[in-house]
């Protein structure tokens, strides 16, 4: 036997396998652990049925789509946001298209910045359903403005809403979960809680704070293995988050979503979220390329990440100033459609 030829064949096979995996990664829309769970892990249809799930920010975007997909799993839903009429609209659609009855859905108006109301809201949920199995911290707001054009009040608002409001509600729900020694705290963070980009630095700061808080909380709860703390970090997703983003003042929003076709569909993002929840994953990254690649670089090769982020950041500012979506030009090479 020609051992040298065999060795070369093995090397060639290894290189081909590496190439195949690289091509698969370039078309991936989630981190490798999450995609493995999607392929081989537990199904949301098996794990989440009959649970009581409280979703904040449920009136639009990811929270709205999450309500629709959860309603098909037979959970009991608590829908919270500030706009009651929008919550009622979401509830009606859940009843029309899901597997729930009127008694299975509670519309509970909630302002995350009104931290004094969170204890009463928690008691209302417990009175209605007797328990809270999953708290999904999804409420929040983004920002689109350069630092020198932004009032300090904008940064204060983002911290109060995205960070302190979420922490406050979690602290109200947590004693109940500790008493039962089980529950899931799922926080919709962002890949901007891992990386940082121009135009959204106040938003980045609030999301970095959330990630630090919940990573630390997970360690504090190590003696309660039945309580799962999960960070969900989506990239650009089709929603109205840009339209509602704060501009340079707290009284001004962007007011225009622009073209959203280059972003991940909300339904795909939420499906991957449910897979993460079913498999008790501690942190997941849900994003198409190139943001997924950049997130990996920030985690494992930060020097390279700085170089790429500077290049992408300049283009992001150019896009914003020209009136198009700040992230619109990054997806042309990598864009993949997922049903």
From Swiss-Prot:
GO CC list: endoplasmic reticulum membrane; membrane
Family: Belongs to the short-chain dehydrogenases/reductases (SDR) family.
GO molecular function, a single term: carbonyl reductase (NADPH) activity
Coiled coil residues, start to end: none
Signal peptide: 1-28
Active site, UniProt feature: 203
Encoding gene, per UniProt annotation: DHRS7
Binding site for substrate: 190
Protein name, per record: Dehydrogenase/reductase SDR family member 7
Superkingdom field: Eukaryota
Top-level EC class as recorded in UniProt: oxidoreductase
Residues at which NAD(+) binds: 60, 62, 203, 207, 239
Compartments where found: Endoplasmic reticulum membrane
Function: NADPH-dependent oxidoreductase which catalyzes the reduction of a variety of compounds bearing carbonyl groups including steroids, retinoids and xenobiotics. Catalyzes the reduction/inactivation of 5alpha-dihydrotestosterone to 3alpha-androstanediol, with a possible role in the modulation of androgen receptor function. Involved in the reduction of all-trans-retinal to all-trans-retinol. Converts cortisone to 20beta-dihydrocortisone in vitro, although the physiological relevance of this activity is questionable.
Reactions it catalyzes: all-trans-retinol + NADP(+) = all-trans-retinal + NADPH + H(+); 5alpha-androstane-3alpha,17beta-diol + NADP(+) = 17beta-hydroxy-5alpha-androstan-3-one + NADPH + H(+)
Pfam families assigned to the protein according to its UniProt record, in alphabetical order: adh_short (PF00106)
Record EC number: 1.1.1.-
Database matches in InterPro entries: NAD(P)-bd_dom_sf, Sc_DH/Rdtase_CS, SDR_fam, SDR_family_member_7
UniProt keyword list: Endoplasmic reticulum, Membrane, NAD, NADP, Oxidoreductase, Signal
Tissue and organ expression note: Found predominantly in the adrenal glands, liver, thyroid, prostate, small intestine, colon, stomach, kidney and brain. Lower levels observed in skeletal muscle, the lung and the spleen.
Organism of this sequence: Homo sapiens
């Amino acid at each position: 036997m020609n051992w040298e030829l065999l060795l070369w064949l093995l090397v060639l096979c290894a290189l081909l396998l590496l190439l195949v995996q690289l091509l698969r990664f370039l078309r991936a829309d989630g981190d490798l652990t999450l995609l493995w769970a999607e392929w081989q892990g537990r199904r949301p249809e098996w794990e989440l049925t009959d649970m009581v799930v409280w979703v904040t920010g449920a009136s639009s975007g990811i929270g709205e789509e999450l309500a629709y997909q959860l309603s098909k799993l037979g959970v009991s839903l608590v829908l919270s946001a500030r706009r009651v009429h929008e919550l009622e609209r979401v509830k009606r659609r859940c009843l029309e298209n899901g597997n729930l009855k009127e008694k299975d859905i509670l519309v509970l108006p909630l302002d995350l910045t009104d931290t004094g109301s969170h204890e009463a809201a928690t008691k209302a949920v417990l009175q209605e359903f007797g328990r809270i199995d999953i708290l999904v911290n999804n409420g929040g707001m983004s920002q689109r403005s350069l630092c020198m054009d932004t009032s300090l009040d904008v940064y204060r608002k983002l911290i109060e809403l995205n960070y302190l409001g979420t922490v406050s509600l979690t602290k109200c729900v947590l004693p109940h979960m500790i008493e039962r020694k089980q529950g899931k705290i799922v926080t919709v963070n962002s890949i901007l809680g891992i990386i940082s980009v121009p135009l959204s630095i106040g938003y980045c700061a609030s999301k970095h704070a959330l990630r630090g808080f919940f990573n630390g909380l997970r360690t504090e709860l190590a003696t309660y293995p039945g309580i799962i703390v999960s960070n969900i970090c989506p990239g650009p997703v089709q929603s109205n988050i840009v339209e509602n983003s704060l501009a340079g003042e707290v009284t001004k929003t962007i007011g225009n979503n622009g073209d959203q076709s280059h972003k991940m569909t909300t339904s795909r993002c939420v499906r991957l979220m449910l897979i993460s929840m079913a498999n008790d994953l501690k942190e997941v990254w849900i994003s198409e390329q190139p943001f997924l690649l950049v997130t990996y670089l920030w985690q494992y090769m930060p020097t390279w990440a700085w170089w790429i982020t500077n290049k992408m950041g300049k283009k992001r500012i150019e896009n914003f100033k020209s009136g198009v979506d700040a992230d619109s030009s990054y997806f042309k090479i990598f864009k993949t459609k997922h049903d």
